[in-house]
Curated annotation (Swiss-Prot):
Catalytic activity, reaction form: a 2'-deoxyribonucleoside 5'-diphosphate + [thioredoxin]-disulfide + H2O = a ribonucleoside 5'-diphosphate + [thioredoxin]-dithiol
Residue spans crossing the bilayer: none
List of residues binding Fe cation 1: E89, E120, H123
Protein name: Ribonucleoside-diphosphate reductase subunit beta
Function: Provides the precursors necessary for DNA synthesis. Catalyzes the biosynthesis of deoxyribonucleotides from the corresponding ribonucleotides.
Keyword Iron: yes
Organism whose genome encodes this protein: Chlamydia muridarum (strain MoPn / Nigg)
Binding site for Fe cation 2: E120, E193, E227, H230
Note describing how the cofactor binds: Binds 2 iron ions per subunit.
Gene: nrdB
Pfam family, one: Ribonuc_red_sm
InterPro entries attached to this UniProt entry: Ferritin-like_SF, RNR-like, RNR_small, RNR_small_fam
The keyword Iron is annotated on this UniProt entry: yes
Gene Ontology BP annotations: deoxyribonucleotide biosynthetic process
């Protein structure tokens, strides 16, 4: 053997030794062999959706916002929607970087988490771009989670879920610790991204369906496509951890998760009532009661729990929008051509 060749073959990763959490014996820096193909597929799908908000024209939105066409109630919906999303994406990004990434010990899952964290940064950039374009008070929008009770209540709820996992002494190598980690994943993937965000998408995309605020609507369609992948990854991660650690999925944990989701539904309904005190064309607060309960049931089912509300979807067009997003070529609507690495100059 040549002197400069090390005998390190025994450190090559065995596929069957990989686990999603609590796997210190496997080198997390070695991506291959890939065991969790779903994680890699989510990463590839995310990379196929590269975009920046500045690639989308806001000209028509600016013109409409400065006109008298939008009612005060319509403006209220848009402003409170931006007030929630502007910091919510940062909360999700911080939880990925500071809480989830540390405790996920699988490289292909981590690869997607890095991609997701970047996307959360792009989403936060999006809300700044919208505020700047419309000439809104950026400080008021980005501080809404401290000034608006319905928004603060949702974000405080999310921060409660993060607290224990952010503790430097937190560990996942006990049943109780891993159960706490699962609750964190449910809080952010199922509740924040799977319930709170989807309710917010309905509000803005309903304007887009009426050919109003089309630039914002285009950006929200991008975000919706990202968030659909985020939700799918989160569901797969939760179910994967459950499968590898069946002892954690106790009746008590299941009941805790159901109660978390019930609380989230109540918070989202309060927020919808704040956004829509009188209702606007195509949207009423009462419709959001049904919608939030409907999607909560769908999220419960995806992690192996029974539905509890049994309400119908008052916005069937949202399902169509999600399906269309899988096929639509957003690149055709961009105002600037996407710069590939080969075209960059130094």
């Amino acid at each position: 053997m040549q002197a400069d060749i090390l005998d390190g073959k025994q450190k090559r990763v065995n596929l069957n030794s990989k686990r999603l959490v609590n796997c210190n014996q496997v080198d997390v820096n070695q991506l291959v062999p890939i065991k969790y193909k779903w994680a890699w597929e989510h990463y590839l799908n995310g990379c196929a959706n590269n975009w920046l908000p500045t690639e989308i024209s806001m000209g028509k939105d600016i013109e409409l916002w400065k006109s008298n066409v939008l009612s005060e109630d319509e403006r209220r919906v848009i402003l409170l929607n931006l007030g929630f999303f502007s910091t919510a994406e940062s909360l999700v990004g911080n939880n990925i970087v500071l809480a989830i990434f540390k405790h996920v010990t699988n490289p292909e899952a981590r690869q997607y988490l890095l991609r997701q964290a970047f996307e959360e940064a792009v989403h936060t950039h999006t809300f700044l771009y919208i505020c700047e374009s419309l000439g809104l008070d950026e400080k008021e929008i980005f501080n809404a989670y401290n000034e608006r009770a319905s928004i603060k209540a949702k974000d405080d709820f999310q921060m409660e879920i993060t607290g224990k996992v952010l503790d430097p002494n937190f560990r996942t190598d006990s049943v109780e610790g891993l159960q706490e980690f699962i609750k964190n994943l449910v809080g952010y993937y199922i509740i924040m991204e799977g319930i709170f965000f989807y309710s917010g998408f309905v509000m803005i995309l309903s304007f887009h369906r009426q050919n109003k605020m089309v630039g914002i609507g285009e950006q929200y369609q991008y975000i919706l496509r990202d968030e659909t992948i985020h939700l799918n990854f989160g569901v797969d991660l939760i179910n994967g951890i459950k499968e590898e650690n069946p002892e954690i999925w106790t009746t008590e944990l299941q009941q805790e998760i159901i109660e978390m989701i019930q609380r989230a539904v109540d918070l989202e309904i309060d927020y919808a009532r704040d956004c829509l005190p009188r209702g606007i064309l195509g949207l009423r607060a009462s419709m959001f009661i049904d919608y939030v309960q409907h999607i909560a049931d769908r999220r419960l089912e995806r992690i192996g729990l029974k539905p509890i509300y049994h309400t119908k979807n008052p916005f069937p067009w949202m399902s169509e929008t999600i399906d269309l997003n899988k096929e639509k070529n957003f690149f055709e609507t961009r105002v600037t051509e996407y710069q590939h690495a080969a075209s960059l100059t130094w």
